[in-house]
C-alpha cells in the first residue's frame, strides 16, 4: 500500500498532463502529494522526512511554476530532489560515522562496512546521474519527452538500480542470511 501511495502523485501528474497540460498536471501533483501526506499522517501517525521534503519541494517549485506560468520550475524540482538525496548520502559517507544507506537498512541487514560505503556511494552517483539526465532532457528536448522520462524513465532506472543493489547486497550477505 505504501509503495502505491508513493507513486500516486506521479500517476496523477501523468494523467493530468495527458488530459490537460503541464500546469493542470502541476496543480494536480501538488494536491495529490498533499493528500498522500495527510493520508500517511492519519493512517500511520507518522510522516517520513523524505515525504515531507518532497512535498515542500513540490509545493515550492509547483507553486512557482503556476505563479509565473513557467514550466522550468517544475522541471528543476526533479534535479533538486536528486541533488538533495545525493548530497545527504555523500555527507553521511564523508562526515558522519555511518553511511545513510546503512542507517536506513542496517537493522535488517548485516553487511561489512565496505559494502555499506560502496552501496551508499553508488546511490549518490546514481542520483547525480539522474539529476544531470533530467537537466538535459528537461531543457533540451520537448516537454512531452521530459514528462515521459520523468514518469517512466526515472521510475524504470530507479527500479533497475534497486534490483542491482539487491543483487549486490545478496552477494555480500552472511551465508545464514541468504536462506
Curated annotation (Swiss-Prot):
Membrane topology (UniProt): Multi-pass membrane protein
Cell compartments where the protein resides: Cell inner membrane
Superkingdom, taxonomy of origin: Bacteria
Residues that span the membrane, as ranges: 22-42, 50-70, 76-96, 121-141, 149-169
Hydrolase listed as a keyword: no
Pfam families registered for this protein in UniProt: IspA
Keywords, comma-separated and alphabetical: Cell inner membrane, Cell membrane, Membrane, Transmembrane, Transmembrane helix
Signal peptide: none
Disulphide bridges: none
Primary localization: membrane
Entry GO terms, CC: plasma membrane
4Fe-4S listed as a keyword: no
HAMAP family in alphabetical order: YciB (MF_00189)
Purpose of the protein: Plays a role in cell envelope biogenesis, maintenance of cell envelope integrity and membrane homeostasis.
Family membership: Belongs to the YciB family.
NCBIfam families: ispZ (TIGR00997), PRK00259.1-2 (NF001324), PRK00259.1-3 (NF001325), PRK00259.1-4 (NF001326)
Protein name: Inner membrane-spanning protein YciB
Source organism per UniProt: Salmonella typhimurium (strain LT2 / SGSC1412 / ATCC 700720)
Amino acid at each position: 500500500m505504501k509503495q502505491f501511495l508513493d507513486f500516486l502523485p506521479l500517476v496523477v501528474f501523468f494523467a493530468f498532463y495527458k488530459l490537460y497540460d503541464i500546469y493542470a498536471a502541476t496543480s494536480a501533483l501538488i494536491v495529490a502529494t498533499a493528500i498522500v501526506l495527510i493520508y500517511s499522517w492519519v493512517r500511520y501517525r507518522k510522516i517520513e522526512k523524505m515525504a515531507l521534503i518532497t512535498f515542500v519541494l513540490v509545493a515550492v517549485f509547483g507553486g512557482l511554476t503556476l505563479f509565473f506560468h513557467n514550466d522550468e520550475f517544475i522541471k528543476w524540482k526533479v534535479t533538486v530532489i536528486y541533488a538533495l538525496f545525493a548530497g545527504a548520502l555523500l555527507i553521511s559517507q564523508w562526515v558522519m560515522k555511518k553511511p545513510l544507506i546503512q542507517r536506513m537498512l542496517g537493522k535488517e541487514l548485516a553487511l561489512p562496512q565496505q559494502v555499506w560505503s560502496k552501496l551508499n556511494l553508488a546511490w549518490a552517483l546514481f542520483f547525480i546521474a539522474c539529476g544531470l539526465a533530467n537537466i538535459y532532457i528537461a531543457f533540451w528536448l520537448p516537454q512531452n519527452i521530459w514528462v515521459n522520462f520523468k514518469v517512466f524513465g526515472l521510475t524504470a532506472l530507479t527500479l533497475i538500480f534497486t534490483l542491482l543493489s539487491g543483487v549486490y547486497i545478496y552477494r555480500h550477505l552472511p551465508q545464514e542470511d541468504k536462506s
